[in-house]
Amino acid sequence: HSLDSVWVSDDSEHVFLVDSRGTVKNIVDLREYLDDKEQLLINTNYAIHTSRLYYNKNRQSLMFLTQNLSSKVFAVKEVFINKEKDVAIYYLSPSNIIPDMSAGYSYMSFPNVNYVGENIIYNYPAESSIYTLNIVTNERNSVMAESNYTSNIVAECTSGKDYAALERHRLENPYFYDVMYIPQYKMYA
């Protein structure tokens, strides 16, 4: 693909390769790669979670986060543009600190996901650890990213579905945003 092109996603669960003139060069229907009980999680709403569509130039693939709605398991799927390889699925490890965030954590139940080369970097908004998964070696690592300034774990919200209480919980607790890795400095930010 040319350097003047960009992959764009929309709510139809399609992604489009668009060049600098606005010409659509390629369309990929991500729904084709979802199971019946899966949802696509491409989102940059910082109040909920951040998980972008990623184009891996070296592997000629698109990567995106999914969740199985019955098991609540998160996975990153890798779709190869030329369709010469089958879809690869990389299951994300649950939080080491709060293994089940499906209830009690307000809007903080989805992971933030970023990509650097062959690594998936992710974290959970309710705790400060950073997790990595190498898609070539399947090596998994986690780093306890402890803060000296705030609690490293969000308190569980016990108020049920009361909107005002959920908002209060969100405002009164820390929220751990997506983590990026800057390779030239070997630093997470």
Per-region residue spans from a language model:
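Flexible, glycine-rich surface segments
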Residues: 113-116, 123-189
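Beta-propeller blade signature
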Residues: 17-20, 73-84, 132
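Short coil turn/linker residues within repeat-based beta-strand modules
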Residues: 21-24, 83-85, 137-139
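Asp-box/WD-like beta-propeller blade repeats and closely related beta-sheet repeat scaffolds
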Residues: 9-72
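Surface-exposed loop and turn segments in beta-propeller and other repeat-based domains
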Residues: 1, 27-46, 86-106, 141-171
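Structural signature of eukaryotic scaffold interfaces centered on beta-propeller domains
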Residues: 2, 45-58, 104-117, 171-185
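A long, hydrophobic alpha-helical segment
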Residues: 90-123, 128
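Conserved beta-propeller blade signature
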Residues: 5-7, 62-63, 119-122, 188-189
